[in-house]
């Protein structure tokens, strides 16, 4: 039995809410909470995270500590927090009041901004209309990668390069159990990394409701519990994220189609799945469902990855088709009908029938309900907030970061933008440089890019040279018996400086950050080739690709330097 001490409860209803929150924590079998005693008794499975327990309570606005936690450890943790708060307060010594920062949203950009603003001495009011944590942890990056990993394991059990010595088998898929495992990890991370952190910081006030601008110095918040509240601010960050876009296809809105949110929450695997779209989300989920047992058809308006180097789309299309995924290029749905539990899609290549329909054609910024015009904030034609490198909007008091802006829609970009916005909102000067921004698509093989493609460089007037190394020249790929894909390096003609890398490989995401650092540090291709790379790693492919500018790597020994 695990015991918690809980402070802040004021009634038996508080205790009931705490009990409900604790019993949602993965690993908690039961909870007995007493308001008069200020305690909770928990039956938990071994390995249950103590941080998740305390975070669940903190998320409700109360404080929880393990009753049997070592006093010294508690003191150290408390002292560390006090030192942090005092250091922030020192930034605003004297009579100068702290900057009042309002943050709309609670995802990656919002959290990063709130925490950095507090470090800078600000008082933060964070406003969230839905579930704390935003898209990434709740319905995006985290659950999708868990599902993709499970699908990868199922695929390897069914088929691998080592089937000659390791007998293949058809796995039994229990989607409901996979979903429970997936959701447990999502809940754990949300408690530990969002709710608990917010609840444990006295400089952050969380308001649950929907915000809209009253003017350029205040917000009106329609509270989830009823009523309204006005929040005044010196600076405001809009970090409201984005939602799945829905194309105007006749009959679509009247049908029970899936977006990525519903697909990730489904406890069944459809026999037939049609996917409209060739976005990152569309392709990642298409392959995951196929590997878990669905017969998948992808409808791509153009080709896969048509904005990238053509070789990328060709490689992924070939990999999908090899797994039995049907890819219909240059195909659009002109009509959607749902009859007798079946979707019927009218397309430019005939009729398509499916049990479920996933629509993943991009994401739309969540800005329409904010009354941005009342604050003089400019948006583009898509509704995205227009910002500069400092995350400043057209209103000097209002900043924006993340998917609600015209920045690339990646959570790590959002978090970096949120941090820099907070610095600028509290009197600093920080800019976000995206010239060496790595991007990864978690298909198999993965797609990873950074910097210029050749076409992009030529568009900007840069003369280039390039080399493409197929993976049958990379020892790690040969040892894996999986040589699908390539690594392409793009250099600036004359200076020979590396300016872009595109990779399609089973672990391309693990090598692209090295390429990003090389570009960021303005390395030449020869300097990259001269570096030491561990033998039999996929990232060694970068060195080999760099060597191809001056020699034939097929004529080198295995680990020639």
From Swiss-Prot:
Q: Which cofactor does it need?
A: FAD
Q: Which residues bind a metal cation?
A: 11, 14
Question: Where, by residue number, does FAD bind?
Answer: 110, 130, 135, 145, 211, 403, 411
**Cysteine disulfide links:** 136-141
Record: residues binding Hg(2+): 558-559
Q: Which reaction does it catalyse?
A: Hg + NADP(+) + H(+) = Hg(2+) + NADPH
Molecular function (GO) terms for this protein are: flavin adenine dinucleotide binding; mercury (II) reductase (NADP+) activity; mercury ion binding; NAD(P)H dehydrogenase (quinone) activity; NADP binding; oxidoreductase activity, acting on a sulfur group of donors, NAD(P) as acceptor
Q: Where is the HMA domain?
A: 2-65
Q: Report the record's Gene Ontology biological process terms.
A: detoxification of mercury ion
Q: Which Pfam families match?
A: HMA, Pyr_redox_2, Pyr_redox_dim
Disulfide bond keyword on record: yes
Top enzyme category: oxidoreductase
Keyword annotations for this protein, in alphabetical order, are:
Disulfide bond, FAD, Flavoprotein, Mercuric resistance, Mercury, Metal-binding, NADP, Oxidoreductase, Plasmid, Redox-active center, Transposable element
Cofactor binding: number and manner: Binds 1 FAD per subunit.
Question: What Enzyme Commission number(s) apply to this enzyme?
Answer: 1.16.1.1
Subunit and interaction comment: Homodimer.
Q: What does this protein do?
A: Resistance to Hg(2+) in bacteria appears to be governed by a specialized system which includes mercuric reductase. MerA protein is responsible for volatilizing mercury as Hg(0). Plays a pivotal role in mercury resistance under thiol-depleted conditions and cell protection. Protects cells under thiol-depleted conditions.
Q: Anything further noted?
A: The active site is a redox-active disulfide bond.
Give the family from UniProt: Belongs to the class-I pyridine nucleotide-disulfide oxidoreductase family.
Q: Which PANTHER family match?
A: MERCURIC REDUCTASE
- Would you tell me the protein name for this molecule? Mercuric reductase
